């Protein structure tokens, strides 16, 4: 690669800061992600690599000469943090009934860019097990919130979705609120059993 200077497993940028020091230094080691693709004119190639060292080898398999340019810096995205909070671990919601759960996302998880909720059941009669779940935003200075009195701000997460045993339902929250009120209704013809609800935050 003409744009890099090699010293063993250490590669440095062929460009320097004017005093002989390379502008960037990278360590490229053994390849663990083999990749063979076709390059199109003026279309960049993006590859996602997670926690992996990589070696860049370019081979021209075409029948004509190909000019490959390294015109953009390698960009990395690191998941800074992730947190979960178990709202309920093994709850039961009777047929046609609704249960409510209030969670302060900031107190339970911290401040994150993205929040979500996951629901899980050990329900065995999955064909008749359905769930209707909605979420409401709540001001932090209100200790309890009644969805029946202020239902105009709700966001429906799952609308009479079949709850399959050992298969989680998950939804990213479409809004960010410091405090949420989650309502879960057994919308099928059987009780919801073994209900587990987890809220999560991710940066």
UniProtKB/Swiss-Prot annotation:
Residues 1-23 are annotated as: Disordered. Residues 7-18 have a biased composition (Basic and acidic residues). It comes from the Bacteria. This is SPbeta prophage-derived uncharacterized protein YouA.
């Amino acid at each position: 690669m003409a744009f890099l200077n090699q010293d063993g497993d250490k590669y440095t940028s062929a460009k320097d800061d004017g005093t002989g020091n390379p502008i960037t230094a990278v360590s490229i080691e053994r390849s663990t992600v083999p990749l063979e693709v076709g390059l199109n004119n003026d279309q960049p190639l993006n590859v996602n690599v997670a926690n992996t060292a990589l070696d860049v080898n370019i081979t021209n398999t075409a029948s004509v000469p190909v000019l490959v340019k390294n015109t953009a810096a390698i960009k990395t995205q690191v998941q800074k943090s992730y947190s979960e909070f178990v709202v309920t671990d093994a709850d039961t919601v009777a047929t046609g009934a609704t249960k409510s759960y209030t969670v302060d996302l900031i107190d339970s998880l911290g401040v994150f860019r993205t929040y979500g909720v996951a629901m899980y059941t050990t329900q065995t009669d999955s064909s008749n097990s359905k769930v209707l779940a909605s979420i409401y935003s709540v001001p932090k200075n209100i200790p309890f919130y009644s969805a029946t009195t202020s239902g105009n701000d709700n966001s429906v997460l799952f609308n009479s979705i079949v709850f399959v045993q050992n298969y989680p339902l998950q939804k990213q929250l479409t809004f960010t609120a410091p405090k949420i009120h989650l309502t879960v209704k057994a919308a099928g013809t059987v009780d919801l059993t073994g209900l587990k609800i987890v809220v999560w935050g991710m940066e």
